[in-house]
Amino acid sequence: MPRLGVVGATGAVGRVVVGLLGERGFDDVRLFASSRSAGTEIDGRLVEEATPGALSAGDLDVCFFSVGSKASRELVPHAVRGGALCVDKSEAFRLQDGIPLVVPEVNGARALEHDGIVANPNCCSIPLSLVLKPLQDEAGLRAVRVATYQSASGKGARRLQQLLDEPQAEHDLSADWSFDGEEFDEETKIREETRKILELPELPVSATCVRVPVAVGHAESVWVETEEPLDASRAREVLAAAPSVRVDEFPTPRAAAGGDEVLVGRIRPDRAGDGLSLHLACDNLRKGAALNGIQIAELVLSQRPVAA
């Protein structure tokens, strides 16, 4: 049984990682967090402080990081030196050359090329890639446009609690991303990560991101132009056969919450141009984050692609 660590165990994603590891039969799990949360317990397990010494001690085989980019940059190298495979959820390493950015059902073989770190993609890039990959294989991709509707939990446990505590009439979440030139950094991430995952470095991808007053579950409206003709009926068949994707007449965040599949529907011709329009929803804490990271680790540990 591998010896596992979860850094950021008290956060929104970290807690889901801990729960999913238990569901999947992993019981040698140590929990780490900041000094502020150290000493608390999760499901009877003591939370330790995530220090360089603790992470580099050489007694962890896999370490899941669900912390901010600054903390990941500081702590991940120590765990790597200790011999652990580090699966990092932050943006710190995603676009770095030589570090695989992996969705197991899409480009799982890349995880086996790791040198101690595998990056876990953005919570919108994961479901988008899962839907685009089968369309890419069927007809090629010419261009992608996406509008995201992202839940409060995507910003973390504090943002989620704020939503749950405030009166419904005050649910008007402002944009909480930083500008990167003329677009949000989140929009840049989706474009660059999707290109890297699909191995299409020149693919035109345009994203518009919106934060919405939903607790859990991200939704995305997607417009796809393919290289070869692809009608809605055939696209529906292709997506129905894709791993970790389920065709649903009208996907919603509520329907996706608590599940491990990407729901995709509204598959139809794009009336404003060539291509297709579709809508998807995904639990951003599970397949959009925690589950994808665990599947990466399972893939590397087994040295074979994970089953959907």
Regions found by a protein language model. Give the residues of each.
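Oxyanion-binding "anion nests"
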Residues: 172-215, 221
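Conserved active-site and cofactor/substrate-binding residues in soluble primary-metabolism enzymes
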Residues: 8, 12, 70, 123-130, ...
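C-terminal active-site/capping subdomain that shapes the small-molecule cofactor and substrate pocket
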Residues: 206-211, 216-308
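A broad, low-specificity signal for short, low-complexity segments enriched in glycine/proline
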Residues: 25-28, 179-187, 239-243
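N-terminal Rossmann-like NAD(P) cofactor-binding subdomain of oxidoreductases
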Residues: 1-175, 203-204, 256-263, 267-272, ...
